[in-house]
Design a protein with these regions (language model features):
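Bacterial N-terminal signal peptides that target proteins for export
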Residues: 1-8
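Processing junctions and N-termini across compartments
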Residues: 13, 41-44, 108
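C-terminal motif of bacterial Sec signal peptides marking the signal peptidase cleavage site
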Residues: 15-18
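Electrostatic cytochrome c docking/interface patches
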Residues: 20-43, 57, 78-79, 147
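Short pre-active-site segment immediately N-terminal to redox-active cysteine/selenocysteine motifs
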Residues: 34, 43-49, 54, 125
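Gly/Gly-Pro-rich "capping" loops immediately C-terminal to redox-active cysteine motifs
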Residues: 35, 39, 52-95, 101-103, ...
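Generic structural signal for secondary-structure transition and capping sites
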Residues: 47, 94-98, 138
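C-terminal capping alpha-helices of c-type cytochrome domains
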Residues: 88, 109-147
Length: 147
């Protein structure tokens, strides 16, 4: 019986180790995208109306959109933005609103103020856009706690 328990623990550890990482998406995995085409899609879809991307020359929204609070994407993060989280934030932006921004600025009628692109964005644009955004995040491990 101990032998079976040990093997069960070993198998569980192997399965757990295989699940994770920045490309995990809880079962969601699209083909690899193209970063440059993703950047082009970001501009074509006018994502820069409300967003800017850390580490790029993409300009912040113009003055005509001054009422919009700019949501910065990319940059240093202490939690890994998974592939699934990026896809979800594009196709269902109300699922998780950007932290640190006043709700009245980023919502309309309790939903995300972000436009719904599900009827206009192609799957190729989605795949490439996610590749572009994921390339702009840099994971910075938190400082170890000292006791």
């Amino acid at each position: 019986m101990r032998f079976i328990t040990k093997w069960a623990v070993v198998l569980l550890m192997l399965f757990t180790a295989a699940c994770g990482g920045p490309k995990s998406g809880a079962g969601l995995r699209l083909p690899d995208g193209d970063v440059e085409r993703g950047k082009a899609a970001f501009l074509e879809l006018k994502c820069n109306t409300c967003h800017t991307v850390s580490g790029t020359e993409i300009a912040a929204p113009s003055k005509e959109y001054a009422y919009v609070r700019v949501v910065v994407l990319g940059g240093e993060v202490r939690q890994v933005k998974t592939y699934g989280a990026l896809v979800t934030s594009i196709i269902n932006p109300s699922h998780s609103l950007a932290p640190g921004y006043p709700k009245e600025v980023i919502t309309k009628d309790s939903q995300s103020a972000m436009a719904n692109f599900n009827d206009t964005m192609t799957v190729r644009q989605l795949i490439d856009l996610v590749a572009f955004l994921q390339s702009r995040y840099e994971f910075v491990p938190p400082e170890p706690a000292t006791y």
